[in-house]
């Protein structure tokens, strides 16, 4: 038999649990947000499902790191969800010292603003599992929050 190990990053989608929907809801409520750019590997649930289907059909074995084609940035995600909700949010670097300091003391701050990503080369496959673009996936999540 063959063993296929998947090591996906944060999985998100409509009605998902965890930090991503909290971030989306925060974007619709907060008047101000730090301009602390980062890089995040993420994977939309439909793209994960397609990867699993392809792995089964092709009888893949090994360790795989599926992720979206584009690396995400928390600031850009906040901008997207705020705009989709018709909410104005002021993104400023004035709060960055608090993010830097808070990341050492508070785990949730570190989780939100830290850079966590796989090298995109690790995720390239001979088949296409990216059925939904990053922007379209954000739109679907935003629509599910309405």
Predicted regions and their residues:
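Conserved beta-loop-beta element that borders a ligand/cofactor-binding pocket
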Residues: 1-14
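Conserved active-site beta-strand element of glycosyltransferases/polysaccharide synthases
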Residues: 3-5, 32, 65
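Residues that recognize and position ribonucleotide moieties
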Residues: 4, 41, 70, 92, ...
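Residue-level signal for the nucleotide or nucleotide-sugar donor/cofactor binding architecture
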Residues: 40-43, 72, 129-132
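Mobile cap/lid helix-loop segments that border enzyme active or cofactor-binding sites
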Residues: 100-126
């Amino acid at each position: 038999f063959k063993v296929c190990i998947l090591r996906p990053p944060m999985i998100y989608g409509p009605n998902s649990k965890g930090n991503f929907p909290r971030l989306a809801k925060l974007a619709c409520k907060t008047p101000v947000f730090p301009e602390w750019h980062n890089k995040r590997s993420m994977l939309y649930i439909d793209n994960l499902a397609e990867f699993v289907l392809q792995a089964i059909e092709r009888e893949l074995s090994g360790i795989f790191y599926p992720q979206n084609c584009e690396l995400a940035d928390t600031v850009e995600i906040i901008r997207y969800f705020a705009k989709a909700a018709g909410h104005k949010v002021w993104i400023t670097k004035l709060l960055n010292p608090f993010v830097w300091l808070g990341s050492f003391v508070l785990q949730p701050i570190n989780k939100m603003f830290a850079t966590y990503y796989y090298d995109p080369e690790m995720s390239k496959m001979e088949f296409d599992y990216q059925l939904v673009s990053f922007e379209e996936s954000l739109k679907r999540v935003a629509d599910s929050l309405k």
